[in-house]
């Protein structure tokens, strides 16, 4: 990741006030709810910071969830209960100053590896994401996610069994 720190759990020491990704809903969530959700255990948020600072350059957030068979792709439904257990990639955003530099892909890669490690210890079938925009949807498709049967911007990446 070079110009940023390794991913680490969000804490009160991280500076989020100046984070601007271009998606206000993601920026506001990080600034207003990120730490609260972390403390409550509702989601786990991981951040990367600009090198030698605590200023957040990007983040992603993971939570547990489930998806009904009707929304899942065919290969996820096979031999699975209804609903199917998943890990939700609830948010992923990169500060505008790092757009176009591969940081989003690096964060996604870290999130997927983290989810793989979780799947070795608990029963989850896939990573699920709700893309905010068509651009975000195309980003996830480019990285191997498959679209839902029924929800246009819901995508899945199957985890190994």
Curated annotation (Swiss-Prot):
The main enzyme category here is transferase
Q: Which InterPro entries match?
A: Acyl_CoA_acyltransferase, GNAT_dom
Short name of any one Pfam family annotated for the protein:
Acetyltransf_7
Keyword terms of this UniProt record = Acyltransferase, Repressor, RNA-binding, Toxin-antitoxin system, Transcription, Transcription regulation, Transferase, tRNA-binding
Keyword Manganese appears in the UniProt entry: no
Q: Which of this chain's residues are annotated to bind tRNA?
A: 29, 33, 36-37, 75, 77-81, 91
**Family recorded in the similarity comment:** Belongs to the acetyltransferase family. GNAT subfamily.
Q: What does this protein do?
A: Toxic component of a type II toxin-antitoxin (TA) system. Acetylates all 3 Gly-tRNA(Gly) isoacceptors, no other tRNAs are acetylated, tRNA acetylation inhibits translation. Specifically recognizes the discriminator bases U73 and the C2-G71 pair of the tRNA acceptor stem, as well as the charged aminoacyl moiety. Expression in the absence of antitoxin is toxic in E.coli. Upon induction of the toxin gene during lag phase, the lag phase is extended by several hours. Neutralized by cognate antitoxin TacA1. Also acetylates cognate antitoxin TacA1. The TacA1-TacT1 complex represses and probably derepresses expression of its own operon. TacA1-TacT1 complex binds 2 sites in its promoter DNA; neither protein binds DNA alone, it is presumed TacA1 actually binds DNA.
Q: What protein am I looking at?
A: tRNA-acetylating toxin 1
